[in-house]
Amino acid sequence: MMKRFLMLYAFLLTAFTLLAHNNRVAGIDMVSYPGGKCMMYRLYLKDKDLDHNPYSVNRPEEFLSARSIERRKRQGLPIDLTDLPLAPAYEKAVTDAGIEIVGKSKWNNTLLIRIHKEKELRKLEGLDFISKMMKVFAAPDSVSQRMRSGVRRELNEWGNGAGFYGAADAQLKAMNGKRLHESNHLGKGKMIAVFDGGFMNVDKIPALHDIKLAGVKDFVVPQSKNIFSEMEHGTMVLSTMAANAPNFYVGVAPEAEYLLIRCEDERTESLAEEDYWASAAEYADSCGVDIINSSLGYHGFDDAATNHHYYEQDGKTALISQTASMCADKGIVCVNSAGNDGMGAWKKINFPADAKDILTVGSINEQGTNAAFSAVGPTADGRIKPDVMAYGSPTCVITGRGSIINDNGTSFSSPLIAGMVACLWQALPHKTAKQIIKLVRLAGNNQQHPDNVFGYGVPDFWKAYQTGKAIK
C-alpha cells in the first residue's frame, strides 16, 4: 500500500534498558506476528476439472447473488468459466494432504496456502493438478502493535462550513458534481466496494452514522477481530464518498451503499496482498457491487527479490493487475489510485493501477495542476496513465478520530472519482461499465491532448452525463 514511511532513529541502549523495554523499538510497542512463524504459497491450478466440477455456468445462482447476475444481464455480459468456483476435488486433495487453504481466486484459478515449515510442501508432491507454486509471504519476527484511537468528542463538534457540503465543497465543485446532485443523483441504488487496510471508528463517528452499509469482510491472514479497530486510512477514504453531515461535511455519493473490505495488511508488504485483493474483487462481484474503489498499490515488498518491475506493467502480468483488468468484463467499474511515487526513484504508477479498462486516478492541487507526488505513466505496453485526476493535494477527509483535516495522496483522489461514478451511473443506468469509463475519460479537461502526467484531466461529471444522455 502507499504508506507513509516514517524514519525511526533508535539509539544504542544499555543491556538493562533493552531487557526493561523488551519488544519496544524507538518508543513503538512490538509484538510477535499474530499469525505466528509461517509462510504462504500461491498454487496455480491447471484447470477447473470440468468433468467433475458440480457447478455450471448455466446455474450461476449457485455461486453468484441475484444482484450480480442481474448486473451482468443488464450489460449483456456472459457468465463464463472464470466465474466458476474452483474444483472442489482439488481443494479437498490439498486439505486432505494436511495443508491449510487460507485464500482462493476463481478468476485466476489459484489457491493460497499457509504452512509453518518448508518441508510441508512435500505433502503436495504427486498432486498433478498443481501447475506452479510461488512463495508470496514469509512472516516477520515482530510487527508494531496497533491500538484503536478513541473518537474525541471535541473533534466532532465542528463549526459550520461553506454551505451545504461544508468542508468538502471544493473537491466536489472541481468535478462539477453539484449539478448531478441537484438533479437528484447522489449514488442511490449503486453499491461501492471499498478495499483498504481498516476502517477505524466508522461505527462510532457521528458524521458516518447514516452510511448505507451493505456489509463488511476481511481477507487478510490472519483476519482482524474487528475491521473498525484497524487503521484509519479506510475511514478517510470512505468519508470522501459516504459522509452525510449537511453544512459540515457531505461526501460525493452519500446515497450509495458501501461494502467495506479489508484486503491490505499494513504490518507487512508482500505478494500475498495481491491474493487478498483478488479474493476481495471476486467477493465484491459475487455480492453484486457496481464500483470498486481501491486506494491501494504495490511494487516494492519486504522481500526485495519479489519486487515488481516496470516491464511487468501490462495489465496482466501481476496477479492483482490481471484481476483488476477483468472487472469491467464482469460489469464493474474499478477505480484505483495512481500512487504517490512521483517524486521518488520509481515515479511510475503502482500495481494494479496499470490494469486495463479501469480508471486510474492521479492527484491535482488546489490550483488544478498535478501534484508533484502523483505517479505517472505510461504503462509498459504504452497505454496512457493515469486516466483522470481529482483533488489530492490536499483532499478534505474525516479521520479515524472524527476530525476534519486536509491530507495528501492519490488515495483520496480515487474515491472522489469512484463516488461520482456512482452518481453518473445512477443517472445513466443503461450504460455498461466500459461505457461509463469512456464517458468519464472524455469528460476530462485534458481529453483533447491526454498525456502520462495529467491523463485525460479532471472530469466534468455533468458534461459526462450530458454526453451519455445524448448517446442512445
Predicted features and spans:
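Bacterial Sec-dependent N-terminal signal peptides
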Residues: 1-25
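Primarily auto-inhibitory N-terminal propeptides
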Residues: 21-96, 100, 118-144
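Subtilisin-like serine protease catalytic core
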Residues: 34-36, 132, 168, 178-217, ...
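Structural recognition of the beta-strand scaffold that forms the well-ordered cores
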Residues: 42, 103, 110-114, 191-196, ...
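Autoinhibitory propeptides
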Residues: 89-172, 178-181, 356
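Catalytic-core environment of secreted peptidases
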Residues: 203-214, 363-412, 448
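Hydrolase catalytic cores
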Residues: 238-241, 261-265, 348, 388, ...
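Substrate-binding/access-modulating region of protease and related hydrolase catalytic domains
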Residues: 244-247, 260-354, 380-383, 400-414, ...
